[in-house]
Amino acid sequence: MLTLINTNRMAPPISPVGLEYVAEAARRTGIDVSVLDLGLSPAPDDALRDYFARHTPSLIGLSFRNVDDCFWPSAQWFVPELRELVTRIRVLSDAPVVIGGVGFSIFAERIVQHVDADFGIRGDGEGATAALYWALARGRGFEKVQGLLWRSDGVLRSNPPAWPSDLSLPTRRDVVDHATYFARGGQCGFETKRGCGRRCLYCADPLSKGPVARVRRPAEVADEIESLLAQGIDVLHTCDAEFNLPRDHAMAVCDELIRRRLGERVRWYAYLAVTPFDRELADAMRRAGCVGINFTGDAASGLMLNTYRQPHRVQDLGRAVQLCREVGIRVMVDLLLGGPGETHETAAETIAFLKGTDVDCVGAACAVRIYPGTGMVEALERQGAIEQNPGLRRKYTGPVDFFRPTFYVSPALGSDPAALVKDLIAGDERFFEPTAEQPDAETTDHNYNDNADLVDAIRAGARGAYWDILLDLRRR
């Protein structure tokens, strides 16, 4: 038996999309699969004890979606909880433990070593997990499992990442309690592709999902949405890095949803790059059921867009917002303030531009999470010794370790960058302001983890992207 455990206990709860894909893919190879969902358990320790008293798996797989919450100043790190979970499982079962997931794939070696797991899978888990199960049954062949981290003669070995170019994923989505997830989480995720060919300064998606976009067949995506609709789930959100990269695939997905008239039955939200985005794609998305877009704007300063390696220009962002207005799609722009080279002037330029648009809301995050292997590390190394960099923000002591939540805020924004940004926003309620760094500061940002207002709104019946729900709360 293969036991798959959802470890994500963030609230509102998000259904474990990747775990569902892995479970169905494993079943297709003849493996008996059982799922323990700690995401919905009120007492996870009791759930673990009860489960392993009744089951004796051959392999235990843990999905690890988030290494941390990626927000400063909260900087919540979830790896210690994962380590505690592995320790508890060791007491209850002798089965080997394998860890996978998007968050895991960014820090695969570090996590395997830190939590003392037997195996890890970097990249796509659908084929690799089943391959590992059968390799264990044979007692050999670990070197052939794509993405596998494994030990041989006491040495941790790492196979090439599991990023198959032919991306085909299961569509049934029937291994977790979607009704409860929908009632408590307000939406359900789905994927149209994985990977990203862009090299934005800060982004870890190419590290976790692959350096090129790998697309699913549009018919497969539509089949999955129909399966979720049959379970009563009619509000969805893409899990893609950017839905419109590549544009022709986004159009093909929309065309298939329109052909099946799914746009009349489902509401969905998406993350998009600012370009490519035109009237044809906007129209197609709206007809296919899209009701909200979150653009990765980052900045509205030419200097900062160049710093972040964004290909769009300021006027492209304004045009994207206007197109959403014209077709009736609600629109959010996420900003990333405080990167290398940010000044009072560039931040003011960005905020003034967004205030002059007809955007529904703006996320004004003020700090950049630093991931190893990204351009952010290279940029900071060019500034001198990282240990002495005055822009670093962290809650831990000792040597700088990007495995732990470590952020950068340009020193040019002063000693209280959140206050500076709030002054620039000047009370415009469309902006989710950054939270100040003081311990007793009121939370004003759009960190969704453990957001009591959001949890209460969903419990009361709100459905949709979390920024859209919070926006509606502000407008009441």
Where is each model-derived feature located?
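Radical SAM enzyme core and accessory elements
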Residues: 1-7, 49-54, 58, 374-476
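Conserved, mostly hydrophobic/aromatic
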Residues: 148, 238, 354, 373
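Radical SAM [4Fe-4S] cluster-binding motif and immediate context
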Residues: 170-332, 352
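Acidic, low-complexity intrinsically disordered segments
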Residues: 1-231
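Non-cysteine beta-strand/loop elements that form the S-adenosyl-L-methionine
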Residues: 61-64, 125, 282-300, 362-368
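Hydrophobic residues within beta-strands of alpha/beta enzymes
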Residues: 60, 97, 120, 236-238, ...
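Catalytic cores of alpha/beta
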Residues: 108-115, 281, 341-355
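Conserved strand-turn element in the central/C-terminal portion of the radical SAM core barrel
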Residues: 38-41, 272-275, 300-309, 321-346, ...
